[in-house]
Amino acid sequence: MQPAMLLGLLGAAALAAVSSAPVDNRDHNEEMVTRCIIEVLSNALSKSSVPTITPECRQVLKKSGKEVKGEEKGENQNSKFEVRLLRDPADASGTRWASSREDAGAPVEDSQGQTKVGNEKWTEGGGHSREGVDDQESLRPSNQQASKEAKIYHSEERVGKEREKEEGKIYPMGEHREDAGEEKKHIEDSGEKPNTFSNKRSEASAKKKDESVARADAHSMELEEKTHSREQSSQESGEETRRQEKPQELTDQDQSQEESQEGEEGEEGEEGEEGEEDSASEVTKRRPRHHHGRSGSNKSSYEGHPLSEERRPSPKESKEADVATVRLGEKRSHHLAHYRASEEEPEYGEESRSYRGLQYRGRGSEEDRAPRPRSEESQEREYKRNHPDSELESTANRHGEETEEERSYEGANGRQHRGRGREPGAHSALDTREEKRLLDEGHYPVRESPIDTAKRYPQSKWQEQEKNYLNYGEEGDQGRWWQQEEQLGPEESREEVRFPDRQYEPYPITEKRKRLGALFNPYFDPLQWKNSDFEKRGNPDDSFLEDEGEDRNGVTLTEKNSFPEYNYDWWERRPFSEDVNWGYEKRSFARAPQLDLKRQYDGVAELDQLLHYRKKADEFPDFYDSEEQMGPHQEANDEKARADQRVLTAEEKKELENLAAMDLELQKIAEKFSQRG
């Protein structure tokens, strides 16, 4: 039975091996494998000494095993490749991706066709030949190449978007329309054609730009009509200042054109920047123009230093540009509500122009960023901007000079610093006129925070103002009080100056007692007898009570002191103080009463008292009964109960005597404890 079972098992194994072996159209390999398996089985069963596998059979079996492994690898790689294709979505809008697909189209199609043919062979015959596997392995690089190109395209797209964002940040918010026109001309001359995306974007931004320009023009026209109808004198002064500004603007424009030409010669322009500049100018036009007169100075200052169009700055330069624009925005918003129109302050316009010019030059090419020698006027302006205290002093010193330019500049400064704690009486006539004019135009003064005022004024000025304020309208001794008070401390010093004969305690004695006693003495007496006379000595507001001897209700202070005040907090704090001062009883047992022992035996004394009362009640029942009058019914019941009581036996009497003796002993013990306590 055993050889038959072995033969059956070996036959089943042979069939399984034959079915798992690769079948290639029932060719020679299958036959060789089956023969080898049968030979091995027969040799193993018949002859134990003969080697079971011949070298030829061994080679055939090795080949079949390699083919099976190769097919499994091919299947795994096919599935991986299909998953990768699903994960990498194709972007139909990208031109580069389309071209890369056209280049790699033929090998991809061939590989797909061959994989399909290979799959058909596998389904029909149950396996693959070695040649199919080799073809598939040769096709693998083309598929990997396609996926790599797709990834490269996506990374390039991301880099392009980030570059556009950086360029959008770098360009200043207030670039003028003329810069965009120059850039268009330059792009047409150089022959660079923007792509379709930038064309669409530039068309949309141009439409929005025209709409915003129309709105801004309408708004400026309304403001012009209002200002012209209300004030004619301001127009005349504006014309004079414009005449002075025109030559300056022309020189600034010439400088800006030279700078832009140098930048254009140095670097080439990039695609798609036209649309971004249009959008940047559109954002600035959407901003509401609160002051029509101010817009002229902004315009001229931006025209004076335009950036060259074709520049791609580094990330460091972009960060510096962001910081500069934020500073400009903060400065503009701070001075928004209390500056004069640029027509009336030419010096302020020049100052802002030079400041912005310095900010913008830091963003240009290396030639523009080279340090240029500054004139003495620009250095003085920077010093004034950084040190407003010295500016105020200089304006006060120059007040005697009578030139028109200095008057207008001082007037602008006076109005700018109005509401910031200025000294009374300076430029009062000018301020009233300008206030009326600004209120008519709808401008309101903005109050400055105390931190800004403290920064602007030096310490000496603050002290002088305080002294003037304290001595103002006061004569004789009162003026001396305030001066002495400045030398002394706050509230206490005032009272010491006012009442020099009084005696003051450094700290209330009762408070000291409370704190020290509660902390260091666990047996601190909680009943504190407060003396209001001592406590009120330190309070100057109650001085009149000491003189009169009575308070408002007519009760004297001595009557108030007759009642103690109970300290409830002491009992809550006591356990904590016991834990802290655990060795206090050993150190000072002679002074402190032993309250703990007394408390322990209070219960024993109470029990003794109750027993005593019980004993007395047994001896004199009629005396210790309740005092309520008993009714006739209750009296009859009591008489019946007494009649029912039987006479006590000798044993019961002995028990009662023993109980009485125990009661007496307990009473003696309680008396001893109470005497000790």
Curated annotation (Swiss-Prot):
Region ranges (Disordered): 63-505, 531-558, 622-646
Sequence ranges of Basic and acidic residues compositional bias: 64-90, 118-133, 148-192, 200-249, 306-322, 363-409, 421-455, 491-504, 635-646
Any single Pfam family the record assigns to this protein: Granin
Disulfide bonds: C36-C57
Signal peptide (residue range): 1-20
Superkingdom as given in the UniProt entry: Eukaryota
Subcellular localization, as worded in the UniProt entry: Secreted
Modification Sulfotyrosine occurs at: Y348, Y472, Y566, Y624
Keyword terms: Cleavage on pair of basic residues, Disulfide bond, Glycoprotein, Phosphoprotein, Proteoglycan, Secreted, Signal, Sulfation
Organism field: Mus musculus
Subunit: Interacts with ITPR1 in the secretory granules.
Function: Secretogranin-1 is a neuroendocrine secretory granule protein, which may be the precursor for other biologically active peptides.
Family, per entry: Belongs to the chromogranin/secretogranin protein family.
Name of the protein in its database record: Secretogranin-1
Glycosylation sites: S93, T115, S237
